[in-house]
């Protein structure tokens, strides 16, 4: 088992510290010094996030993009830790710094530090599955308006929302997730069900994937993606 313990003073150096196997492909943006990221057998990445965390995939995706992976929230019996709860199996995709084209999201890690509201400075698609203590599933398109960091009036609208139990989390259950951005049609597909289909009038043509969670114990495995360049 490979383990990485994070602390606040190394957050800015984190991409250079992920040396073990599968973690070479990822960078961690974490709010808490108690965060841990662990590799388990079968290429599972195990995440304990006492506060906000984004696990960024290091490669930029461009053009028509399909991303697939399995993920779950782990809830253990007889564990009183605050993060041992069923909530927040979230993700960002096609994320970029729209105001600084030369920068990747990783360069903004020291500024954002895993804090959720600071992600509003990025342009991206966001799906929060089982957020707000597993009461909502919501889709948004972030515009990169940095005013949203401090002023809720400038934050992106909820474009699609579910609150029924069929679209909320089940504990310890592996979901298969497929994200698409194809010719401006953005889809989120979970276990074969299309729960988001959004035609973006100004689609995001390139960016990065980030697995997002907070106050939870999450796991991710079998991550793959394909891109077809646009000409």
Identify the function of each model-found stretch.
Residues 18-231:
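Extracellular glycan-recognition regions
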Residues 4-13:
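Sec-dependent N-terminal signal peptides
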């Amino acid at each position: 088992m490979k383990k990485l313990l994070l602390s606040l003073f190394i957050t800015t150096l984190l991409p250079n510290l992920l040396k073990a196997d599968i973690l070479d492909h990822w960078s961690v943006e974490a709010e808490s010094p108690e965060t841990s990221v662990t590799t388990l057998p079968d290429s599972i990445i195990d995440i304990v996030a006492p506060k906000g965390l984004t696990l960024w995939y290091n490669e930029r995706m461009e053009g028509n993009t399909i991303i697939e992976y399995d993920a779950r929230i782990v809830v253990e019996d007889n564990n009183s830790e605050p993060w041992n709860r069923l909530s927040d199996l979230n993700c960002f995709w096609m994320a970029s710094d729209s105001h600084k084209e030369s920068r990747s999201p990783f360069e903004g890690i020291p500024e954002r530090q895993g804090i959720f509201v600071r992600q509003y400075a990025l342009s991206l698609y966001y799906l929060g599955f089982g957020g707000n203590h597993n009461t909502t599933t919501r889709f948004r398109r972030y515009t990169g308006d940095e005013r949203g960091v401090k002023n809720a009036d400038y934050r992106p609208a909820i474009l699609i929302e579910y609150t029924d139990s069929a679209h909320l989390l089940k504990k310890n259950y592996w979901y298969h997730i497929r994200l698409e951005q194809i010719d401006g049609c953005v889809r989120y597909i979970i276990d074969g069900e299309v729960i988001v289909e959004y035609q973006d009038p100004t689609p995001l043509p390139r960016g990065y994937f980030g697995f997002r969670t907070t106050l939870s114990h999450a796991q991710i495995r079998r991550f793959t993606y394909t891109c077809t360049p646009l000409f």
